[in-house]
């Protein structure tokens, strides 16, 4: 399966309503978010406006730790955005549901203010009840305190 097709299928799966998540999707806004998929070298990543999410597909040979370091750096350089990792060789789960794409190294970029509003809205629902506290802290970082547990 080609990269773009694989990623589009992953996004489709993230948008499926899951009974084991109380009827929520892994990513409740995935089905309505505008996005673009950009294949590039990790060092060439720069913000791209006009989309809810920019999905950067970066080098496969990067380790999860390499991807983490790049994400940390990008978050420092571009504080108005949130960059999140999806490392190919690091599976992530909410309960028993695998949330990562499982094949490509991806860095996702979203507008920080808009993402924070969505997280806050979800925090007023039982959505985050299905997340482990560790995963919640890892993903939400500074927004962790916004979420009412």
Model region roles, listed by residue range:
Residues 1-149:
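Expand to "…catalyze enediolate/carbanion chemistry for C-C bond making/breaking, isomerization
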């Amino acid at each position: 399966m080609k990269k773009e097709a694989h990623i589009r299928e992953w996004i489709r799966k993230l948008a499926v309503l899951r009974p084991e998540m109380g009827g929520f999707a892994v990513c409740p806004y995935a089905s309505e978010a505008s996005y673009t998929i950009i294949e590039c070298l990790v060092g060439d990543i720069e913000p791209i406006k006009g989309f809810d999410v920019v999905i950067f597909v970066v080098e496969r040979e990067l380790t999860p730790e390499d991807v983490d370091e790049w994400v940390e750096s990008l978050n420092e350089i571009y504080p108005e955005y949130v960059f999140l990792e999806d490392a190919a060789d690091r599976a992530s789960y909410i309960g028993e549901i695998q949330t990562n794409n499982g094949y490509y190294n991806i860095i996702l970029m979203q507008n920080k203010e808009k993402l924070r509003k969505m997280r806050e809205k979800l925090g007023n629902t039982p959505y985050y009840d299905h997340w482990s506290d560790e995963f919640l802290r890892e993903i939400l970082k500074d927004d962790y305190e916004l979420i009412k547990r």
